[in-house]
């Protein structure tokens, strides 16, 4: 389970004595990127990736995130559910040292027939989210693997 309610739902089922079966799947942070022609890792660009939630249960950006560590320690960031806080997230990453020219992909409605992928950069991502009217759920991908989108998918929507 990645940043969802799966664990809490399983706990409720166990507490209620309900038998259930977990069916494994592929998280949007992998499947959505693949569908957009963006590898999560590539031997030529990164040996690490960090998955981050864009908001907590209360709806705020997680206070415990170490933006300096994230900015310097992970070449590729995959941010789930961050559209509402994209202004703050992009600002914090740039303040922590990521350049405004850093490649960014915004993937709306990942792995559905309505998936829409827009590539941009960290400095312009908020404007592009509004310009292309991208709606949640949305993934925000920051890093060099974003450059593969046009090459592997053959399009930018």
Each predicted region: which residue ranges?
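A contiguous loop/helix-start segment that scaffolds small-molecule binding in enzyme catalytic cores
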Residues: 5-12, 46-48, 52-157
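Short glycine-cluster motifs
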Residues: 1-56
């Amino acid at each position: 389970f990645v940043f969802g309610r799966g664990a809490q739902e399983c706990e409720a089922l166990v507490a209620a004595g309900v038998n259930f079966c977990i069916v494994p799947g592929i998280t949007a942070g992998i499947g959505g990127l693949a569908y957009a022609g963006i590898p999560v890792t590539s031997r030529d660009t990164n040996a690490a990736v960090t998955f981050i939630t864009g908001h907590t249960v209360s709806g705020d950006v997680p206070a415990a995130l170490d933006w300096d560590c994230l900015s310097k320690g992970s070449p590729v960031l995959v941010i789930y559910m961050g559209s509402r806080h994209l202004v703050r997230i992009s600002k914090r990453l740039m303040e922590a040292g990521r350049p405004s020219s850093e490649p960014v992909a915004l993937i709306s409605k990942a792995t559905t027939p309505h998936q829409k992928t827009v590539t941009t950069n960290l400095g312009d991502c908020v404007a592009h989210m509004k310009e292309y009217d991208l709606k949640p759920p949305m993934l925000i991908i920051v890093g060099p693997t974003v450059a593969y989108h046009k090459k592997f998918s053959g399009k930018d929507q």
